[in-house]
Regions:
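N-terminal active-site segment of His-dependent metallophosphoesterases
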Residues: 1-54, 62-73, 132-135
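Conserved beta-sheet core of the metallophosphoesterase superfamily
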Residues: 55, 78-149
């Protein structure tokens, strides 16, 4: 491993066809973008792919025909030595077998440690629920370790 620098992962969900200027500005410089479902726009997916590599999953408002075979209901992958699982619904995540489990759907931020697994919901970057405005999450990783995780308010 021994990468030269920490990698920045920007984590978003539930954009529902709207990528705000504030969100697009925050995503500049990301090494990887993770989208936890409900993109609802093929053009938005293509736009995100011009910013950084994207790992995305289908939400309850997405359809297979929109994004092709690389986007499914569950994404399992290793990045910088960490095992990731991404699904729109929390109950679809194999929390016991990964280092980081990411979900969306609730439009509310949440971070919890479950055993050795960090479970993260970035909230909604476009249509939040609850008292917090639009949000995303940012994670810095290097050599199999999470260096930091934080939520970013997009207002």
């Amino acid at each position: 491993m021994n990468s030269a620098r920490a990698k920045r992962i920007d984590i978003i969900s539930d954009t529902h066809g709207y990528l705000s200027p504030a969100l697009l500005d925050e995503l500049k410089g990301a090494d990887l973008i993770i989208h936890a479902g409900d993109l609802t726009s093929e053009m938005d997916y293509e736009h995100l792919c011009t910013i950084a590599p994207v790992r995305a999953v289908l939400g309850n408002n997405d359809y297979y025909r929109d994004y092709g075979p690389d986007v499914d209901r569950l994404a399992l992958f290793t990045y910088e030595g960490l095992k990731f699982a991404v699904a729109h619904y929390r109950e679809d995540l194999p929390v016991g077998s990964v280092d980081v489990a990411i979900n969306g759907h609730t439009h509310v931020t949440k971070e919890a440690q479950v055993g050795r697994c960090l479970v993260l919901n970035p909230g909604s970057a476009s249509y939040p629920r609850g008292t917090r405005g639009p949000t995303m999450a940012r994670m810095l990783v290097k050599d199999g370790k999470i260096l930091s995780t934080n939520f970013i308010d997009l207002e």
